[in-house]
Structures are given as structure tokens and as C-alpha cells.
Amino acid sequence: QTPFYFSMSVSDVFSTILTGATFYIIPKMYFSFPVKLIEFLEEKKVNTIYWVPSALCILANLGALTTDNLKNLKKVLFAGEVMPTKQLNMWMDKVDAMYANLYGPTETVDICTYYIVNRRLSNDESVPIGKPCDNCDVLIVKEDNTLAQDGEAGELLVRGSFLASGY
């Protein structure tokens, strides 16, 4: 859960309002008690979560996920950290939902790319950051400031109207 003083809370709050959904604030202590956290999600019939991967990993690593719980959960969105593939696969094995990796550095104020996870990834594979969001352009440039070709390494540059002032 994003603190309200952090820019990411804007998308949490307003996307909930826009879709006519209910916004629940999960008591922070529940993240220390996975069974209580799952009970809360089930009791409230939560259908979408947008968490940092470390929160998702807590439930996966402690074996709190089963094929019998979280039946209402339809979307699992994650951002802010690298999602370990092993734990992502643990989620995908137990919870039938749409999974999406959302990427956006601080200067974009929100996400700039997304990847819908549509297959099981091998444990040594990285979760891709995906495609640019609407109103966003993503470029990869080499050290000589020329555009990188597919498969070439380089620096990720983002442009769009949502960049923070000064970028």
C-alpha cells in the first residue's frame, strides 16, 4: 500500500474512484500475519491488488497461498521493485488472476511501461518491463546517444507529458 504522501497513491485512489470500486486500507500489521492478510482480502472480496513485490513475496514464501483462497482476486499488479520470478510463479500456480509488471522511475510520477505476464517464466528469467503506456515513449540509446537496435544494451529514456518538472 502506498502512503498517501507518495505520488503513486494518486493512481491508487483515483483509479478506484473512476471504476466505482471500493478502496480498502489494509492494516499494516496484517503484512506480518499472512493468514490475517488473506482473511482480510477474502472478507472484503478484494479483486485487485497493486503491491510492491516484497509484499507479494511474503505471502508466497510463507506458504500462505492455496488454490482455495483469494478466489475473488482477478488482478495482481506489482511495481517499485524487481519481482522475483520464483515467487511470481508461486502466485501464478495458486491464484488464477491477471498479473502485470508495472514500471516507472520516480521522475515519471507513475508507471511508463507495463507487461502482462501471459506465461510461466523460468526461475532464472527476468520479468520484462514491457511496452510503453499511452502518452509515453520509451527509447533505448547507446553510449554514443544513437538508438539501440533490438537486443542491444543501452540507457532507457522516457518521454511524455507525465514527466516531473525538470526531466
What is the meaning of each model-derived region?
Residues 2-6, 30, 104, 146-149, ...:
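AMP-binding (ANL) adenylation modules
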Residues 3-47, 119:
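Conserved AMP-binding/adenylation subdomain of ANL enzymes
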Residues 18-23, 64, 93-96, 106-126, ...:
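Active-site loops of AMP-binding adenylate-forming
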